[in-house]
Amino acid sequence: MIGNFSCETDEIKRIVLNFALQVQKKFPSNFQKNKKRIIVIAGPTCCGKSALALNLAQTMDGEIISADSMQVYRGMDIGTAKATKEERLFVPHHLIDIRDIQESFNVVDFYYEARQACQKILDQGNVPIIAGGSGFYLHALLYGPPSGPPSVPEVRKSFEDEIERLGSEILYERLSQLDPQYAKTITKNDKQKIVRALEIMMLTNKKVSKLSWKGRRKPQNYDFRCWFLHRPKEKLYERIDKRCDKMLEEGFMDEVRHLDSLGIRGNSSASQAIGYRQALNFLKTEQTASQYQEFIRSFKQATRHYAKRQFTWFRKEPLFRWLDVDMHDPEVVFDMILKDYELL
C-alpha cells in the first residue's frame, strides 16, 4: 500500500510548507486550530483522483464523499467511473447511488448532503475525503450554496418547453446577450444551467454572474485542504481516449439502453451528462457503423472539452494547490497530501 511509504526529505517538507503558507496568506481564518480538517481532491477526468482518495482513506481512517454530479444516480456506473462495490466495501463512500434516474439533484442538494456527510464522518472520528471534478459543486461546498431564488415550477417549465422546441443554441445565445460573463462559464449544450440562469434572471431581474457567489469568498466552518491534480494536456487526452474505449468495452452502451428504458431522457441533467448525451443521440439514429464511429469521436471530444473546462474553472479557485501527477511519483503525491493534512 502506498500509505506505508515514508518520504521525509527536506524538499517534500519545504514544498508542503510553501503550499500551506500560500493558502494561509489568502485565507488566514481557514487555518484556525479549532477547525476540523477536510481533504478535497479535485482535478480533470482521468487524472487519478479516485485511486488517490482510496489510498488516503485506507491509510488514515477516511471516508470518501463523491463530488461528481452524476454519481448520485443509481445505474449511472460505467459512464461516471463510479467506485466499484468492492472498493466501497473497503472504504465507506457517500453521495453515491442516492437518487433514482427520474429524481432531480442540484447544487443546493449537494451542499446540504455533503456537509451533513462531512459532519457525520468527523463525529465518528474519521477523516472526510472529498473527491470529484465538479467545480460548481465544490465551490458551493467551500463557500456556501448559490444565492439564487427557489425554482418556480411554472417559470422553469416554460423555459424547458422552449429549449426543447427551439434548441439549446437559441436559448444559449439569448443568455449570452443577457449575461455574457456567466454564459462563458457553461456550454451551449448545458440545457439545465441555461434554463436555470434564464429562470433566475426572470425572477430577480439580475444577472446570474452578479448574484451567484457575491459576498461568499470565505471558506465556511472547516479547514479545507484542497488539491487539484493535473497532467500535461497531451498525456491527459491520451488517457481520456483510452478510458472512453474501456467504458465501451465494459458495456457502456448496454448501460445507456437500460437507463433509456427507465426514463433518463426525462432528466434534463442526467441525459446531458458527458457520454450519456452522445450515446442517447446515437440510439436515435439508424445505428450504422459510420454513425457509431461518429458517436465514439464525439464522446471522446466532449470528454476532452470537459477536462479543458475543469482546468479553466479551477484556475479561479484560490484554495486549491495544483499537483502535476505526471511529474511526481504517486508515492510523493500521497506523502505531500498526508503531510499537509498533519500540518497544523
UniProtKB/Swiss-Prot annotation:
Enzyme class: transferase
Residue ranges of the region described as Interaction with substrate tRNA: 68-71
Alphabetically ordered keywords of this record: ATP-binding, Magnesium, Nucleotide-binding, Transferase, tRNA processing
Keyword ATP-binding: yes
Keyword Protein transport set for record: no
Site (Interaction with substrate tRNA): S134, R156
Cofactor(s) named in the record: Mg(2+)
Residue numbers binding ATP: G43, P44, T45, C46, C47, G48, K49, S50
MF GO annotations: ATP binding; tRNA dimethylallyltransferase activity
Reactions listed under catalytic activity: adenosine(37) in tRNA + dimethylallyl diphosphate = N(6)-dimethylallyladenosine(37) in tRNA + diphosphate
GO terms under biological process: tRNA modification
Assigned EC number: 2.5.1.75
Binding site for substrate: T45, C46, C47, G48, K49, S50
HAMAP family: IPP_trans
Assembly behavior: Monomer.
Family per record: Belongs to the IPP transferase family.
Function: Catalyzes the transfer of a dimethylallyl group onto the adenine at position 37 in tRNAs that read codons beginning with uridine, leading to the formation of N6-(dimethylallyl)adenosine (i(6)A).
Protein name: tRNA dimethylallyltransferase
Native organism: Protochlamydia amoebophila (strain UWE25)
Organismal lineage: Bacteria, Pseudomonadati, Chlamydiota, Chlamydiia, Parachlamydiales
Gene symbol of the encoding locus: miaA
